[in-house]
A protein has these predicted regions:
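Short, flexible loop segments at boundaries between secondary-structure elements
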Residues: 225-245, 356
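Long, compositionally biased charged/polar accessory segments in the mid-to-C-terminal portions
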Residues: 145-146, 248, 253-452
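Iron-sulfur cluster-binding cysteine motifs and their immediate structural context
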Residues: 29-97, 313
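Entry/capping segment at the start of metal-dependent catalytic domains
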Residues: 81-132
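Tryptophan (W) side chains
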Residues: 8-11
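Glycine-rich phosphate-binding "P-loop"
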Residues: 161-185
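Low-complexity, highly charged intrinsically disordered N-terminal segments
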Residues: 126-154
Length: 452
């Protein structure tokens, strides 16, 4: 079997013996960031010491990679947790900022159209059907890009993300599936440019894409395609393993045998095992109460960009009703979707249920948790009943996605008010206040920047 080639940066290559002399693998210690709000360690190559320096300590940092670059002071301009300017970047990337008068743009950002879609033939190892990695694969097949900057699994831990440059279409197969954790994706921008890549595609989460767009004009690439995935909450790989252990303990399973996990839009978490078993757990049955208070770092609890509004195309699942959910945002996004041709089956997205009640209940729980009070937990006997009802009467399709965006907005206001009130006027965009206003959250003195 011939292993697909991934183009790892020169400082991250490792030769693997005579029969694999041309196979490029990550180093034994790929990228191992520590939890946000702590110091991120340097990259290492075995026997040669640090190659890229450690990220400097910052209170709110997801280690997107810019602080590991040769000009780390660019973080002041690039970081969405310092002084983001979404209207300006939306206008630069899409030709206009979001228009609250257009359907769903207040929630999802600028977009030309929203779709529910799936590949006709799902790709092996993909998280859903494989639209994201297939688009990137097509970019390489057609020669539209020289390389794709994305994440692959650590060879020693399938859940740990490792930043990679992929230069061969077949290499994208190794990048399918979900990772959980932090990896400095954008630290590879300078190596990509140094290797002569002029046309680049990037697959990233919102905090990475914001920094990429903020610096795009000075990066030196002739063409840049950005495929975004939504991101609701992230945590460290180590914390994620703790979560897997809690899930596995309920059925006396080995957490190391869990090969797949997904939070589905039908209010269930799906797990798959190495032996082929599939297990679906209702959200209400998850052992969330056993997680430590810092399981989700403050960066994720105060993020204002769930839908990745600065990508050319966003590929997620929240509005997909069991399929994938696409937001085609601009002309380049249309070009990316067109690469799939008749490989993809598109549908109009649906919407059902009401979101106000669930979001209001979520707000009450977030306020109690932020104040250190115990959550009001549902009686155990009632959980199976409500778990059965939620997929049938709760928000579904686009209404489910709207609810999740509003929950993230609510979470941002509540936690930032408590943990970083001095940041409110610079970190919270105007559209977030519009999202939370129906739930009684309005800015007080000093929480909103004066009009420009």
């Amino acid at each position: 079997m011939v292993r697909p080639r991934i183009r790892w940066p020169r400082w991250q290559r490792k030769r693997c013996g005579p029969r694999q002399a041309h196979t490029l693998l990550p180093c034994a210690l790929p990228l191992q960031p520590r939890p946000p709000t702590r110091d991120f360690p340097p990259f290492h190559r075995p026997g040669l010491g640090p190659i890229v320096g450690p990220a400097p300590h910052r209170d709110l940092c997801t280690d997107c990679g810019i602080s590991r670059s040769s000009a780390l002071k660019r973080c002041a301009k690039a970081c969405q947790f310092i002084r983001p300017d979404y209207p300006a970047l939306e206008a630069r990337v899409h030709g206009r900022a979001r228009d609250p008068q257009r359907a769903d743009e207040l929630h999802f950002g600028p977009h030309r159209r929203a779709l529910r879609a799936a590949l006709k033939a799902a790709l092996a190892g993909a998280q859903w059907t494989g639209i994201t990695t297939r688009v990137a694969e097509r970019l390489l097949e057609t020669g539209a890009v020289d390389a794709v900057l994305t994440m692959a699994p650590d060879p020693n831990d399938r859940w740990r993300p490792v930043s990679v440059l992929v230069t061969k279409p077949e290499g994208m197969a190794q990048c399918r599936g979900m990772r959980m954790g932090y990896a400095p994706l954008l630290a590879l921008l300078e190596p990509a440019r140094a290797q002569g890549h002029k046309h680049l595609a990037v697959i990233g989460i919102p905090c990475q894409v914001y920094a990429l767009r903020a610096l795009e004009a000075e990066l030196g690439f002739d063409k840049l395609y950005v495929i975004g995935t939504p991101c609701s909450d992230n945590t460290t790989t180590e914390r994620f393993h703790e979560f897997l252990a809690l899930l596995a303990a309920e059925t006396n399973d080995d957490p190391q045998r869990i090969s797949y996990l997904e939070f589905r839009a039908d209010y269930h978490v799906e797990m798959r095992y190495d032996d082929g078993r599939i297990r679906a757990v209702p959200f209400l049955q998850l052992p969330l109460s056993k997680l430590p208070a810092d399981f989700f770092p403050m960066t994720c609890r105060t993020c204002v960009d769930y839908t990745n509004v600065l990508a050319d195309i966003t590929v997620g699942y929240m509005g997909g009703e069991g399929e994938q959910w696409l937001l085609v945002r601009n002309e380049r996004g249309e070009e990316l979707l067109a690469l799939l041709g008749d490989e993809v089956v598109p549908h109009a997205p649906g919407s059902a249920g009401k979101r106000h009640g669930p979001v209001k209940g979520f707000l009450a729980n977030v306020q109690r948790a932020a104040g250190g009070l115990p959550l009001r937990r549902m009686p155990q006997w009632l959980r199976p009943i409500v778990g059965w009802l939620m997929p049938r009467i709760g928000p579904r399709g686009l209404e489910f996605a709207r609810a999740r965006v509003e929950m993230k907005a609510v979470e941002t206001i509540v936690h930032l008010r408590r943990e970083g009130p001095q940041r409110m006027k610079t970190m919270v965009p105007a559209h977030v206040w519009a999202l939370v206003e129906p739930y009684g959250l309005v800015p007080v003195a000093g929480e909103r920047a004066p009009p420009a």
